[in-house]
Swiss-Prot record:
The active site is at H24 (tele-phosphohistidine intermediate), E102 (proton donor/acceptor). It comes from Saccharomyces cerevisiae (strain ATCC 204508 / S288c). Keywords: Cytoplasm, Hydrolase, Nucleus. The record marks H166 as: Transition state stabilizer. It is found in: Cytoplasm; Nucleus. The keyword S-adenosyl-L-methionine does not apply. It is an enzyme of class 3 (hydrolase). This is Broad-specificity phosphatase YOR283W. GO terms for cellular component: cytoplasm; nucleus. Metal-independent phosphatase active against a broad range of phosphorylated substrates including nucleoside tri- and diphosphates, phosphorylated organic acids, and amino acids. Shows no activity against phytic acid, phosphorylated carbohydrates, and nucleoside monophosphates. Present with 8300 molecules/cell in log phase SD medium. Substrate binds at Q36, G37, E102, R103, Y104, M105.
Amino acid sequence: MTKEVPYYCDNDDNNIIRLFIIRHGQTEHNVKKILQGHKDTSINPTGEEQATKLGHYLRSRGIHFDKVVSSDLKRCRQTTALVLKHSKQENVPTSYTSGLRERYMGVIEGMQITEAEKYADKHGEGSFRNFGEKSDDFVARLTGCVEEEVAEASNEGVKNLALVSHGGAIRMILQWLKYENHQAHKIIVFNTSVTIVDYVKDSKQFIVRRVGNTQHLGDGEFVVSDLRLR
């Protein structure tokens, strides 16, 4: 019997667009703690298994997406394909965009985190995050993409929208929504975890419902009370 999880279900309210925000499956760079950024890495066998399990889990819950928008990087494309295949949703309209990509890390892409930290220190930078795409530009790109996709979904009558993206990108979206008083960057968004956000049309408000659910992997999630955010 599938455990009941509030809001982890189809939305049938015409005034709401339910966003299912999914992180891609595991890659070898994830395992080795290598900064990927815009590097076009593939998911590994564990990542494939994670995405397959998520697909089966969505099907067991009877969740059907009206539309899917994914980052155009390979690891997200592969995750999207497996999730849709195993949830029997291969015919759902699906598109790919650079707007949902991970943060571009510049010269430190391909370095392990410890190596990137040493590189930053050597070059007089307080953090390796100071390289590549600036935080303001990253936020503007992501939020602009989310708002555009939500507006388009609203015009199309979409009620359940899946967004497939990256760990850093999802944390930044949560931070933009003022989740956990701007401390969202401290949250670990696990591979293939599902974060659920409702967009309420009449109030133009985003409400975070679930964060980082990994029950398809036999785990739990971060506890979220209903937060009316942005």
